[in-house]
């Protein structure tokens, strides 16, 4: 009589069930690049904010720190746009690539102060030579990039809040499994219209974050409009 041998299939452990050491070894190079860019952006923000020199006095130092900030800001935005596209195409690991809560908060705070600093530099720089024109141009670019970073960082905060809460903090119509695109959509909607549009906010904590986001976006947009009017009128 022939005995039937049943093969034993050993299931591979899920990433969430692996020990911390194993999970740390699974951190992709792309995630490390993201962390490095986030840290460099924070350092560049500190360099821009804490620069004691007047841009009209120390043109070289201001231009260098501003150029570094713009470079890292473009990298930050490019990484986030790439994440949104990959999540939209079905990448199931996009939650693992989100910035931590502390990092996201620090980037939001540093970006807000950087915007105010760049706006003041634009308003206080006098003269019409080439260096002053470069300073003004850098200031405008920094303000626009800071505006985009603000809403992208809030999108990640909303995603973290949704994923870590016991009950969903947001409800997207006909979207039972939202991706990063939905949170970016919601964040930019709040930032441009100061409204939640068709998204339902379902927790008190989420409403508090949305309120702070809306107020900060109002200040941002007001500063940008004032800056544009000042540049157009020459004041």
Across the structure, where does each feature detected by a protein language model lie?
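Pore domain of cation channels
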Residues: 182-189, 201-235
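Alpha-helical transmembrane segments and their membrane-interface junctions
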Residues: 111-134, 190-204
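Membrane-proximal soluble regions of multi-pass membrane proteins
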Residues: 162-203
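Juxtamembrane helix-capping/reentrant segments at transmembrane boundaries
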Residues: 91-110
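Membrane-helix interface/capping segments
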Residues: 79-97, 120-128
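Membrane-water interface of transmembrane alpha-helices
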Residues: 74-88, 152-164
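The first (N-terminal) embedded transmembrane alpha-helix
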Residues: 28-55
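Alpha-helical transmembrane segments
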Residues: 52-75, 134-150
């Amino acid at each position: 009589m022939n005995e039937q041998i049943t093969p034993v299939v050993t299931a591979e452990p899920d990433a969430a069930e692996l020990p911390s050491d194993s999970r740390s070894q699974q951190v992709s190079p792309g995630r490390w690049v993201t962390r490095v860019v986030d840290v460099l952006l924070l350092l560049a923000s500190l360099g821009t904010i804490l620069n004691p020199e007047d841009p009209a006095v120390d043109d070289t130092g201001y231009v260098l720190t501003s150029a570094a900030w713009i470079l890292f800001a473009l990298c930050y935005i490019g990484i986030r746009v790439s994440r949104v596209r990959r999540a939209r195409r079905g990448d199931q690991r996009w939650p693992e690539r989100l910035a931590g809560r502390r990092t996201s908060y620090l980037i939001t705070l540093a970006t807000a102060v950087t915007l105010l600093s760049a706006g003041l530099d634009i308003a206080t720089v006098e003269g019409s030579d080439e260096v002053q024109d470069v300073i003004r141009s850098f200031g405008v670019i920094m303000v626009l990039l800071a505006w985009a970073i603000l809403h992208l960082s809030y999108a990640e905060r909303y995603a973290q809040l949704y994923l870590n809460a016991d009950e969903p903090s947001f409800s997207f119509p006909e979207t039972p499994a939202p991706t990063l695109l939905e949170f970016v959509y919601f964040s930019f909607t709040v930032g441009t219209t100061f409204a939640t549009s068709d998204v339902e906010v379902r927790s008190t904590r989420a409403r508090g974050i949305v309120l702070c986001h809306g107020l900060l976006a109002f200040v941002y947009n007001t500063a940008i409009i004032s800056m544009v009017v000042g540049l157009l009128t020459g004041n």
